[in-house]
Regions:
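Hydrophobic faces of stable alpha-helices that mediate helix-helix packing
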Residues: 250-253, 372, 376
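Short, compositionally biased low-complexity segments
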Residues: 80-96, 229-230, 373-384, 435-439, ...
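Glycine-rich phosphate/diphosphate-binding loops and the adjacent beta-loop-alpha structural elements
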Residues: 380-397
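Acidic, Ser/Thr/Pro-rich beta/coil linker or hinge segments at domain junctions
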Residues: 355-363, 370, 377
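Acidic, metal/ion-coordinating pockets
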Residues: 2-13, 19-354, 395-407, 471, ...
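Feature captures C-terminal
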Residues: 29-41, 45, 51-67, 191-198, ...
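Short, Φ-rich (hydrophobic/aromatic) sequence segments
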Residues: 368-372, 543-545
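Short, solvent-exposed loop/turn motifs
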Residues: 221, 389-390, 491, 513
Length: 573
């Protein structure tokens, strides 16, 4: 099914008649008017983290770039981002792509995302265009209670109904190799192609997944190459993919790009070459400068909502590099005009998904309701109410992470607590209930154990240095992690631009310096090391118990490091 503009406006009017909130500005009626252009269209979303329902998600106020990445996309936040892209303050775009005045703007513009609303937009755009592909950049099966409890099945069924045609992955691998193979052999067979050129077996180096596909769109051969997250066995427990090897595989990618361009003698080579990537945007920018023959990189992993493609020059041409945000908040639309065997022009829009501007697709809404029904009572349990603004996003800390850290320290009697620098997890506004579903939206992983250890001060510092280098190494190919680990109970300083091993300093508990040889009781969760595989209770149990005892969550002071050498950096607001 697809929606014409007339049908779309009729659905919008029906929603208003039913009492659903609609913003009153006249331009809202035309917010999703996107005139068709060219003869090939690519629709792309990524990193939805299993968010089937509309939600709130605050963008970061700290997304520092270092080296060549400083003060350029994607490392722009707040007012610097608005100025760079020409967004008006207090506009829908300002709310979608920045953290500015988030609470007030969220109440004004309502929730974002939701697969039923995304489905409506996808149908509208595909009806208006001729040949198109819908691509999913991965991190789709993880991030919610229902996705964890169904081992991703709720999202897999939603992907199929949405019409996804091609996918790559990252967090999706944390259900284990056997589950991934099962989905590809059964659920995806004949409908969705899972592509990854950079995954091979550890024994003989055989490809695990199909590396690329070539589709004919309106007579134009379009090649799509898959690029899974290259550091999956480092960022997550190795046991999930024990027989698979991951990497950037730049050389192999170049060979594939040359191959699909050249054809095989029986048919013409691809006129458009696309990399569906889960590298992260900084990695993609470097890759685009070194690998030739790729027209477009549709990127993910770093959750960067980049409204305008970055054009990267290389030895034989140029590559458009994009990154399409996260949590189902946006849908990227790339229209290409292909003539004479090459792209001669393009149009790109990163469309925010405002739930109050897009009527819910009935078929998708029914599917979501059916998937949630067996768990509805458990999901709806109100464990507490927040008076604080609870969010997770940013290089160093966030209020939701601070809440988890406080819970770890209090419930485990620890001096120090660590919480992973995950980028996923929905946002709660002051006055909203914290349901069990919200607890799970911050913690739903397949290795949730809480760990309590004795750790020497020098070990703590060494660990922080390693994590910091994963984030701030000036060579993007060495940026292997998420954001900086969140820390409770201990203050420290951080110099992102310093050399490896010299970024962390002035570690203190209260006024007392952390001593190198002294041991400290440290609580954490999400252990990657095999030693802690069955170490303790799931973190969601601990957090829910803590919240039930507190009943009300009040604003708390963020434990943000003292930053050195970042004055004037437009990735910090």
């Amino acid at each position: 099914m697809s929606l014409s503009r007339r049908e779309f406006l009729q659905a919008l009017a029906a929603a208003a008649a039913a009492g659903l909130p609609l913003a009153s500005r006249p331009q809202d009626e035309t917010f999703y008017d996107l005139p068709p252009f060219g003869n090939v269209s690519l629709l792309h979303f990524t990193d939805c983290h299993a968010q089937l329902l509309p939600m709130s998600f605050r963008e970061p106020n700290a997304n520092l770039g270092v080296g060549a990445g400083a003060n350029r996309p994607p490392h722009l936040v707040g007012e610097a981002l608005l100025r760079h892209y020409g967004f008006k303050p207090d506009s829908r775009e300002a709310h979608a792509f920045s953290h500015i005045d988030f609470g007030r703007a969220a109440r004004k513009y309502g929730k974002m995302g939701g697969f039923a609303h995304l489905a409506t937009l996808v149908k509208k755009l595909r009806a208006e265009r001729g040949a198109s592909l819908l691509l999913d950049g991965g991190d789709t099966w993880q991030g919610s209670a229902t996705s964890l409890w169904t081992r991703g099945q709720d999202m897999i069924d939603a992907q199929k109904l949405l019409g996804v045609e091609i996918m790559t992955g990252h967090w999706d691998f944390t259900y284990g190799a056997a589950r991934v193979k099962e989905v590809l052999a059964k659920d995806f067979a004949g409908s969705i192609e899972f592509l990854a050129q950079n995954v091979e077996t550890t024994d003989f180096g055989d490809p695990v997944f199909k590396p690329y596909t070539v589709r004919s769109l309106g007579g134009v051969p379009v090649a799509v190459i898959g690029q899974a997250f290259p550091y999956t066995p480092i960022a997550h427990p190795r046991r999930f993919v024990p027989d698979w090897k991951f990497g950037i595989e730049e050389g192999r990618l170049q060979r594939i790009a040359d191959e699909v361009r050249g054809g095989n003698g029986r048919k013409a080579g691809a006129q458009v070459v696309v990399l569906l990537s889960h590298n992260g945007m900084d990695v993609d920018l470097k890759l685009a400068s070194r690998v030739t023959g790729i027209d477009v990189i549709l990127g993910g992993h770093t959750h960067d909502g980049v409204p305008v493609p970055v054009v990267v020059a290389n030895a034989k041409g140029r590559t458009l590099v994009t990154n399409a945000g996260s949590h189902g908040k946006v849908l990227a639309v790339l229209d290409l005009d292909v003539k004479g065997g090459r792209i001669v022009d393009y149009r790109y829009r990163l469309l925010p998904i405002f739930a109050n501007l897009l009527p819910a697709d009935r078929e998708m809404a029914r599917l979501i309701e059916a998937k949630r029904a067996p768990y509805a009572e458990k999901l709806a349990e109100k464990v507490a109410v927040t008076e604080a603004f609870l969010y997770r996003r940013g290089n160093f800390s966030s209020t939701m992470d601070q809440l988890i850290l406080d819970a770890l320290m209090e419930m485990k009697g620890a001096e120090i607590a660590f919480s992973p620098g995950f980028r996923w997890g929905t946002t709660l506004l002051p006055g909203e209930a914290i349901t069990y579903e919200q607890v799970m939206s911050q913690t739903a992983i397949t290795y949730p154990q809480v760990v309590v250890t004795e750790m020497a001060g020098e070990t703590i510092r060494a660990n922080l240095e390693d994590i910091c280098d994963n984030l701030f190494n000036p060579d993007p190919y060495y940026q292997q992690g998420g954001d900086m680990v969140r820390i409770g109970g201990m203050s420290y300083s951080c110099a992102p631009g310093a050399r490896r091993g010299a970024r962390i300093g002035d570690m203190r508990i209260g006024e007392r310096p952390v001593e190198p040889r002294k041991t400290y009781k440290v609580a954490s969760w999400a252990p990657v090391a095999e030693d802690f595989r069955d170490a303790g209770e799931p973190v969601w149990d601990l957090l829910a118990r803590y919240l039930r005892e507190k009943k009300i969550v009040r604003p708390r002071k963020l434990n943000v490091p003292r930053l050195i050498g970042v004055k004037g950096n437009r990735g910090l607001a």
